[in-house]
Design a protein with these regions (language model features):
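Glycine-/small-residue-enriched transmembrane alpha-helix faces in small-molecule transporters
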Residues: 1-38, 44, 127, 146-173, ...
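Specific transmembrane alpha-helical segments of multi-pass solute transporters/efflux pumps
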Residues: 15-16, 20-21, 47-100, 106, ...
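Membrane-interface helix-cap regions at the ends of transmembrane helices
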Residues: 19, 23-26, 30, 44-62, ...
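Transmembrane alpha-helices of multi-pass small-molecule transport proteins
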Residues: 30-79, 104-111, 162-167, 184-203, ...
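Specific alpha-helical transmembrane segments that line the substrate/conduction pathway
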Residues: 35-45, 76, 84-118, 124, ...
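Helix-helix packing/entry segments at the starts of transmembrane helices
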Residues: 39, 96-102, 169-193, 222-262
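Transmembrane alpha-helical segments that form core, pore/gating elements
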Residues: 48, 107-109, 115, 128-131, ...
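Hydrophobic transmembrane alpha-helices of multi-pass small-molecule transport proteins
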Residues: 70, 102, 110, 120-142, ...
Length: 297
């Protein structure tokens, strides 16, 4: 029974997070991307902390939690999501989800550089290189391309994936006392105000034009992909571990592509499919030993 629950939760998380990429594009019609990210994490932070309180968890950060909250709030919430929302506003949901699927690959590269326990191996190096190749395939249009992706958007998403991976590796060096939900809530409430500052510095209008589509998309980003998605992620992380959870990145593009096609009329190019397959091969090379252990277990 638990195995089926985990499978359902995994697919639900992939669907929720995959659909968030076209939702970002839909919401940009009413609010600029950095302000959108700021408002989203203001709301999610409050919801997640309320969840932690309702579960009887401590939400008061101690000295051991401060650095972890800052690393996550600045690196993951502010930098990663700021770049993600700006980049995603320039490309299709399918392309955005595929570029973000490189996060586990870059995590291994940064771990090899900054963590003593993570030694580079030929297969890991090859996997990281394939991740780069897959991203280039996405960004460079083929000879038959009609509607080439915006290379600036792909570049921003690529940098967003790298920022997430670097911050995640930094968090592995920390030993916080707070539970995952409370810690994530504080990260969001640190990153949200930073995104507001970035929005002001970028000269974005501090206003929201609400239409039915914008309201649905933003509500989805906050409550479905945000609150429900993160809580699903917390539970699955405890039960499945980081290796299997990383596979969500490789299922999410399926849902991102379908929702983008159905809701926004987005077209999937051959480059997107080829780039995704190359990135998948890179992931298998990087995570070969961990995947073998997970299957054997």
């Amino acid at each position: 029974m638990r195995r089926h629950e985990n499978l359902f939760g995994f697919l639900a998380l992939a669907a929720l997070w995959g659909a968030s990429y076209p939702a970002i594009r839909a919401a940009k019609a009413g609010v600029d991307p950095v302000l959108m990210a700021a408002l989203r994490f203001d709301a999610i932070g409050v919801v997640v902390l309320a969840y932690a309180l309702a579960r009887g968890q401590s939400v008061v950060p101690g000295r051991a939690d401060v650095r972890a909250v800052l690393v996550g709030g600045v690196g993951i919430v502010a930098v990663h999501n700021g770049l993600l929302f700006v980049g995603q506003a320039r490309v299709t949901g399918a392309i955005g989800s595929v570029v973000l699927a490189t996060v586990p690959i870059w995590s291994v590269g940064f771990a090899a550089a900054f963590l003593d326990s993570a030694r580079p191996t030929p297969s890991r190096v090859a996997g990281v290189c394939l991740g780069l190749v897959g991203t280039v395939v996405l960004a460079v249009p083929g000879p038959m391309a009609v509607d080439a992706p915006d290379p600036v958007g792909v570049g921003l998403l690529f940098t967003s994936a790298a920022a997430f991976a670097l911050a995640a590796v930094g968090l592995r060096r920390e030993s916080p006392d707070l539970g995952v939900a409370a810690r994530q809530g504080w990260m969001m409430l640190v990153g949200g105000p930073l995104l507001h500052v970035a929005s002001l510095l970028a000269g974005e209008p501090q206003s929201v034009s609400v239409t039915p589509r914008v309201a649905i998309a933003f509500g989805y980003l906050v409550f479905a992909a945000g609150a429900v998605g993160y809580l699903l992620y917390f539970g699955l992380l405890d039960r499945l571990g980081p290796v299997e959870i990383n596979l969500v990145s490789y299922v999410a593009p399926v849902f991102a592509t379908f929702v983008g096609w159905y809701w926004l009329g987005e077209v999937v190019s051959t480059n997107t499919v080829v780039g995704f397959l190359v990135i998948c091969v890179g992931f298998v090379l990087v995570k070969r030993e961990a995947l073998r252990a997970a299957i054997a277990g």
